[in-house]
Amino acid sequence: MAPAWSFLLSLLLLSCNAICSLGCHLPHTHSLANRRVLMLLQQLRRVSPSSCLQDRNDFEFLQEALGGSQLQKAQAISVLHEVTQHTFQLFSTEGSPATWDKSLLDKLRAALDQQLTDLQACLTQEEGLRGAPLLKEDSSLAVRKYFHRLTLYLQEKRHSPCAWEVVRAEVMRAFSSSTNLQESFRRKD
């Protein structure tokens, strides 16, 4: 899982750097929304991560699949949008653990939906300026495959509480990195 984590960190660094340098500036509230998503994801935890160590998995989120350093800055916001969209869909599935607090899950979905709205506004503005979609097909396919692997993993594990804990932790690390990096770039500006 270490290679996946390091790649996610690299991707989010590129994404946050790009977001800070695009003509479309996401409001400070976007960083606060990331923190809210993190808080809600943390509150959803019902299983001790240490009891799920045998269920950990490497979801193969490869740097080459998304173009790595080849990813243009303007495309990073598209990647972030696609990741947020798939996260929303993942946590909207019927297989969500019954042990999760429904009101927390609803709040998480609402927070993700607000982020999608903010990101979509930036995408629309950037695509209008450039006249073409920002996300390369390879990047889009890599994100879809990654989330497909998460979904298959949940199905293979029959949506067990430990499987959801592994997926929840994977998503939480991504949002944590995103929040920290956005704030560090904001301080530099």
From Swiss-Prot:
PROSITE patterns: INTERFERON_A_B_D. Keywords: Antiviral defense, Cytokine, Disulfide bond, Secreted, Signal. Pfam families: Interferon. GO terms for molecular function: cytokine activity; type I interferon receptor binding. It is found in: Secreted. Disulfide bonds join C24-C122, C52-C162. SMART domains: IFabd. Residues 1-23 form the signal peptide. GO terms for cellular component: extracellular space. Produced by macrophages, IFN-alpha have antiviral activities. Interferon stimulates the production of two enzymes: a protein kinase and an oligoadenylate synthetase. Belongs to the alpha/beta interferon family. This is Interferon alpha-A. CDD domains: IFab. GO terms for biological process: adaptive immune response; B cell activation involved in immune response; defense response to virus; humoral immune response; natural killer cell activation involved in immune response; positive regulation of biosynthetic process; response to exogenous dsRNA; T cell activation involved in immune response. The keyword Secreted applies. The keyword Oxidoreductase does not apply.
